[in-house]
Amino acid sequence: MARYRGPRLRVIRRLGDLPGLTRKAVPSRRAYPPGQHGQARKKRSEYAMRLEEKQKLRFNYGLTERQLVRYVRRARRVSGSTGLALLQLLEMRLDNIIFRLGMAPTIPAARQLVNHGHVTVNGRVVSIPSYQCRPGNEIGIRNKENSRRLAEENLKFPGLANLPTHLELDKNKLMAKVNSVVEREWVALQVNELLVVEYYSRKV
């Protein structure tokens, strides 16, 4: 399944606010799923609820189904909570770190910054959005006028207001440091990760 490139408002009307996908919130007068029967009240099955939580992760972080399956498999190999490990793997992606630092308004915009070679990790250009950041990594913006201008403009209007505690940022130098792995309380997406793990329990 390919990465979604369609209308974002349609997605958030179905799934709720997805801070990584768009700054737009669900309009209160249209806070129901799209389509002819969007306003009909239905009792959702357990499968439908698990699927919805899985879709929140996929759309918020901009993943294909195949990519998400790989992350679930990696999370299962980590000791402790599989759901928490899954969220931490996704939150520590380079594109998400750039988004959480406020250097891009959304994760798709952050992915574009990384793809175009504007971002460095430990002083070297990294153009892979899925690069897994680790504690101790130094994240920066390439010392080029165009790169710095893009980041500086985005920092004026960050997608999320609060910088999570596992990151520190020097706005003047456009340099940041990953101090630790993200804690669950700092995951901005409202999602039940246990339902996601249950969704894949028989599929992966």
Curated annotation (Swiss-Prot):
Q: What exactly does this protein do?
A: One of the primary rRNA binding proteins, it binds directly to 16S rRNA where it nucleates assembly of the body of the 30S subunit. With S5 and S12 plays an important role in translational accuracy.
Q: Which HAMAP family match?
A: Ribosomal_uS4_B
The protein's assembly and partners: Part of the 30S ribosomal subunit. Contacts protein S5. The interaction surface between S4 and S5 is involved in control of translational fidelity.
GO BP terms: ribosomal small subunit biogenesis; translation
Q: Where is this region: Disordered?
A: 25-45
Task: Tell me the domain of life.
Answer: Bacteria
Per UniProt, residues of the S4 RNA-binding domain are 92-152
GO MF assignments: rRNA binding; structural constituent of ribosome
Query: Organism source for this protein?
Result: Cyanothece sp. (strain PCC 7425 / ATCC 29141)
Report the PANTHER family cross-referenced here. Answer: 30S 40S RIBOSOMAL PROTEIN, SMALL RIBOSOMAL SUBUNIT PROTEIN US4M
Keyword Transmembrane on this protein?
no
PROSITE patterns (UniProt xref): RIBOSOMAL_S4 (PS00632), S4 (PS50889)
Family, per the entry? Belongs to the universal ribosomal protein uS4 family.
Gene3D superfamilies in the record: Ribosomal Protein S4 Delta 41, Chain A, domain 1, RNA-binding S4 domain
Q: Which GO terms describe its cellular component?
A: small ribosomal subunit
Q: What is this protein called?
A: Small ribosomal subunit protein uS4
> Which Pfam families does the entry link to?
Ribosomal_S4, S4
Cite the entry's keywords alphabetically. Ribonucleoprotein, Ribosomal protein, RNA-binding, rRNA-binding
